[in-house]
Amino acid sequence: MIRSIRHSLSMLLSLAALALVPASPAVTQAAEAATRMELPAPNKTGGMPLMQALNARRSTKTNYSGAALSAQQLSDLLWATWGANREDGRRTAPTAMNRQDVRVYVALENGVWQYDAGHALIKVLDGDWRGQMGGGSLTLLYAIPQANEWGGAHVGSLYQNAGLYSASAGLGNFVHVSGLHALDGKLPLPEGWKVYIIQTVGLLK
């Protein structure tokens, strides 16, 4: 009887010890890779001259191929939209008093990701939600505090940046509210925040 109890205690202690063993670096890195996507450095030179991009900018609601953007195109699009363009962390789009109180989420085939100022994507939701939000290669979701009276103006600066990049890169884009509430309650938004508007971007047929 005593021997059986000792054996059981020994097994429990062994299991507890295994539970305390930290995951190997390879396992930890694999888990981080599944939830964080480092983007290639954005290409900040070249492209279409500004006046030509303004002339080419338009809304394209149909004729998307559904193919994914390249990693470089995705990087350039997000940097143009809301990337840091100065060492002090200021962005490509202005906000009143530099509050930077806008979040950009990207709905891709492999989930919904939040754009991080360090030029990376952080996964916040699994699944392909693009079909509920206009299709295309991806959909950008712009979230702001509901109490911010300037939030709409801030978002407008961002989606204009995205639209001009799309024109320069030969991509289609359109700003809309179709499927605006598809992810209500699913995104890790701070209290009092909401998705204000969305923008579909994609390769054309």
Model regions: which residues?
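Bacterial N-terminal signal peptides that target proteins for export
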Residues: 2-13
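Acidic, serine/threonine-rich, low-complexity C-terminal transcriptional regulatory domains
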Residues: 14-15, 158
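C-terminal segment of classical bacterial N-terminal signal peptides
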Residues: 18-27
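N-terminal amphipathic, basic helical "cap/leader" segment at the start of enzyme domains
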Residues: 27-136
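Small-aliphatic-rich amphipathic alpha-helix that forms the alpha element of a beta-alpha
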Residues: 57, 77, 104, 138-186, ...
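Solvent-exposed loop/turn segments at secondary-structure junctions
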Residues: 69, 83-85, 111, 146-148, ...
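Fold-independent oxyanion-binding glycine-rich loops
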Residues: 109, 117, 143-146, 201
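A glycine-rich helix N-cap at a beta->alpha junction
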Residues: 188-205
